[in-house]
């Protein structure tokens, strides 16, 4: 099985397969409540994480929200 290449936060990353954004977030062990996702220059709403697919050549930016004072 061949891997797919994506760009995640400006760096090449290889995934075992095509997956949706929710699966990628889970694989990266991120808290879905504390991130924002952009795919191919478009913001992905959290209610679309199961529908939006991460495929060969996808460009994603994932931003973490950090609390502080």
Walk through the language-model features, giving the residues of each.
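Ubiquitin-like/PB1-type beta-grasp interaction modules and other compact soluble beta-rich domains
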Residues: 1-68
